Amino acid sequence: MLMYRRDFLKSVTAAWVAFGLPNPLGGAFATNRVIPLRRLGQSQRFDYEWLKERARALAATPYHSRKRVLPTPLERLSWDQYQSIRYRQDHALWADSDAHFQVKFFHLGLYFHSPVRMYEVVDGMAQELAYDPAAFDYGSSGLNGKGLPKDLGFAGFRLNTRKDIDRDFAAFLGASYFRAVGQEGQYGQSARGLAVNTGSSGPEEFPDFIAYYLEQPTADADTVVMYGLLDSPSIAGAYRFSITHADVLRMDIDSALYPRETIERLGIAPCTSMYQVGENDRRMGWDWRPEIHDTDGLFLWTGNGEWIWRPLCNPLHLRFNMFLDNNPRGFGLLQRDRDFDHYQDDGVFYEKRPCLWVEPKHGWGEGSVQLVEIPTFDETFDNIVAFWNPRNKPHPGQELLFGYRLYWGAFPPVSSSLAYCVATRTGLGGVVGQKRKYFSWRFAVDFVGGKLAALARVHDVSVEPVLHMTRGRPEIVSARPLHEIRGYRVMFDVVPLEDSAQQIDIRLYLRDTNGEPLTETWLYQWVPPILEERKY
């Protein structure tokens, strides 16, 4: 599907808003009676190799869209009406087994016009699951299901456990989007199967998962295995997911990609998030809540072992960054700020939003982690994307194999022995009480962990900030213990060039007297105001 990102995400982001909350109708559907889903056609042999061949064959044929014209009542549903349509517990897949997991399906309608074929895999045999209007409770939608086509199909699905039938822990809905939660039980950012031409000059392509194959788990399995067939105008692909439900939910993913066309910018393991306003960027801070974001930074563990933290921003114009690397060890969008007082939102609980960490399972070679930041006026628009972009552009006839793990939870599964950044604050520079003679911008960066807690208690110790910037000049640079956080605060002003409003790239870390780093590397991009708007 080809379209402009903002138009597409107006629909998909809004549709994700309430997912992950307890199903208010779930208890009404919880009965001892289970109604098995109807199957279509004959079962057929299935494994991942078969699916890869299916994707390869798709890529060798012209693409055709699977979007369908829905009945008018489904097209005209409001969000509240659509959200009231719930899958009945007595129709849940595997509800009639001893499996730890169950599957419930999403209805087509509102923004979701592309039916996704669903298959169950049992003992290496796959059989398609039939859509049944009777499997849904239509709530306050105004629909009763009787007038809907019998072959309408499904929009997606969600996973829950037998012990908690009202709350799902993972959901796949819309294009190749999916989400999961950790111990906090709160949805936040999304992942995608693939990103195509994100942040490029033309329209972005949103590949679709056109079929899912759900493997029936055994009674004692703590992992559910599923497969996805992906298709788009420029590429097809086969995916294998192994999802382990735990406090930090883990997805082991293998993907095989088959380009139809040469692709300008291919995004592997894309993470999609939202950042409107935070401690470091209050440009869109007209809301009564102090901070509004799903995540507050991009975290990188590079192939050469460097740990990098890049705070997110809500820029005035689209901003695109490349972090060149060779065989990256991991990257992800994190929500480090876990303090409710910093958000004050008791409805969506931003402090509980999960981090998403990407861990390659084998060497990915040369390429870059790419970060796209898009201006947004409100929290309903996902404006942050991060993904891996291979150095070589994919071409038709290739098979591209990528294996990786996704971790969803309050913290990533890896950490360094170095101190890490917990806050970045910005504001007008200069010395309080003294007249300012020129414009400057203040940065206050807080680090905790590592050796800093011990060093903060010692008076005769030298901790040196190492600061670099691409233009302008730094002044009033300091690094001092901050006992309230058992760490250090680095403060400095940036004085931009008088005749330039060009972006300034800033790089900072702390080191000891032996020149050894004490902290991860902090990166930032700041665009000074034009000369006429520099108020001091």
Swiss-Prot record:
Any one GO BP annotation for this protein: beta-glucan biosynthetic process
Where in the cell? Periplasm
The signal peptide annotation in the UniProt record is 1-30
- Main localization (coarse): periplasm
- Modifications the protein undergoes after translation, according to the UniProt entry: Predicted to be exported by the Tat system. The position of the signal peptide cleavage has not been experimentally proven.
One GO cellular component term of this record is: outer membrane-bounded periplasmic space
Taxonomically, the superkingdom here is Bacteria
In which pathway does this enzyme or protein participate?
Glycan metabolism; osmoregulated periplasmic glucan (OPG) biosynthesis
- Membrane-spanning residues: none
GO MF, one annotated term: catalytic activity
| Pfam families registered for this protein in UniProt | MdoG
Q: Does the keyword Signal apply?
A: yes
Keyword annotations of the record: Periplasm, Signal
Q: Which InterPro entries match?
A: Gal_mutarotase_sf_dom, GH-type_carb-bd, Glucan_biosyn_MdoD, Glucan_biosyn_MdoG/MdoD, Glucan_biosyn_MdoG_C, Ig-like_fold, Ig_E-set, TAT_signal
- Known function: Probably involved in the control of the structural glucose backbone of osmoregulated periplasmic glucans (OPGs).
Protein family per UniProt: Belongs to the OpgD/OpgG family.
Q: What is this protein called?
A: Glucans biosynthesis protein D
Gene this protein is translated from: opgD
